[in-house]
From Swiss-Prot:
Domain BPL/LPL catalytic intervals: 33-248
Pfam families in alphabetical order: LplA-B_cat (PF21948)
Molecular function GO terms recorded: lipoyl(octanoyl) transferase activity
Keyword list, A-Z: Acyltransferase, Transferase
Transport found in the keyword field: no
Consequence recorded when altering K165R: No effect on catalytic activity
Other comments on record: In the reaction, the free carboxyl group of octanoic acid is attached via an amide linkage to the epsilon-amino group of a specific lysine residue of lipoyl domains of lipoate-dependent enzymes. The reaction proceeds via an octanoyl-thioester enzyme intermediate.
Domain of life: Bacteria
Active site: C150 (acyl-thioester intermediate)
Protein name: Octanoyltransferase LipM
EC number(s) recorded for this UniProt protein: 2.3.1.181
Deleted gene: phenotype: Cells lacking this gene are auxotrophic for lipoic acid when grown in minimal medium but grow as well as the wild-type strain in the presence of lipoic acid. The requirement for lipoic acid can be bypassed by addition of both acetate and branched-chain fatty acid (BCFA) precursors. The mutant cells are devoid of lipoylated proteins.
SUPFAM superfamilies in alphabetical order: Class II aaRS and biotin synthetases
Source species: Bacillus subtilis (strain 168)
Length: 278
């Protein structure tokens, strides 16, 4: 059977506003049938704290720490909680809800898309699998997250290696198109991450950070020989091709497309109105 060809865009390191604008632009172009489905890899310059679309930043985010670490800040178009984008490979997948391989429900579509990430971890020699909540108590805990920190609890079909979460993802559906994006951690500075949030007390912070160590992990904590960003890109690009049974064709944005993205970045994702609205 012939493999379907999707576009592959590696946009390198870019500003937080540009990164979110390009994801939205790809969703829009795909909804207009101007482009096929897309897998995109990217990084962040500067390192950035992103928050979920619905997140209340006044109650949850420590902006003194965000400024102290010279971090970028952006609100995502997707839900979920706070993510520090630093030593990671970030990916996005843009595909129509009508695609024959895409299930109708969010969780099942997440599982299908994340098969590419699962294969990527396996390409690096890691034994990755999907965590599925087994008990009613586990299911309830997913509905009521205790923490502002995205990696603090495995969610439905979360990717896990040796019982600890290795890739956090979020999904939105607009204009009949699925946008899923997420973080693949190579390394993680836990103290910096936990500085970025507000807590009822120092004791609560200490307890959460202690629990976090048992739940979340970066690739280079699990592998003896350190994985470079280039090695990660290769492993996960091949992982998506295997996991989704597709062929990825590299694509460079045209100047016209770049102009569209820059305009969207400036007018929406770099604006206080968007970022500080909650």
């Amino acid at each position: 059977m012939q493999k379907e060809t999707w576009r592959f865009i590696d946009s390198g390191n870019a500003s937080p506003a540009f990164n979110m604008a390009l994801d939205e632009a790809l969703l829009y172009w795909h909804s207009e049938k101007k482009i096929p489905p897309v897998i995109r890899f990217y990084g962040w310059n500067p390192a950035t704290l992103s928050v979920g679309y619905f997140q209340n930043i006044k109650k949850e985010i420590n902006f003194e720490a965000v400024h102290k670490y010279n971090l970028g800040f952006v609100r995502r178009p997707t839900g979920g909680r706070g993510v520090l984008h630093d030593q990671e490979l970030t990916y996005s997948v843009i595909v129509s809800e009508e695609h024959p391989e895409m299930p109708a429900t969010v969780t099942e579509a997440y599982r299908v898309i994340s098969e590419g990430i699962l294969q990527g971890f396996r390409n690096l020699g890691l034994d990755a699998y999907f965590a599925i909540p087994r008990t009613e108590k586990e299911k309830e805990s997913l509905k009521n997250p205790r923490s502002s920190v995205c990696f603090d609890a495995p969610s439905w079909y979360e990717l896990v290696v040796e019982g600890r979460k290795v890739a956090g993802s979020a999904q939105t559906r607009q204009k009949g198109v699925i946008l899923q994006h997420g973080s693949i951690l190579l390394d993680l500075d836990e103290d910096k991450l936990f500085d970025l949030f507000l807590y009822p007390s120092e004791r609560v912070r200490e307890r959460m950070q202690r629990n976090f160590k048992n739940k979340a992990v970066a690739i280079n904590e699990l592998i003896e020989k350190r994985v470079t960003m280039d090695e990660a890109r290769k492993a996960f690009k091949e992982g998506f091709e295997t996991g989704l049974n597709i062929h990825l064709e590299p694509y460079e944005l045209s100047q016209e497309e770049l102009d569209f993205v820059h305009h969207l970045a400036e007018t929406k994702y770099a604006s206080d109105e968007w970022n500080y609205k909650r």
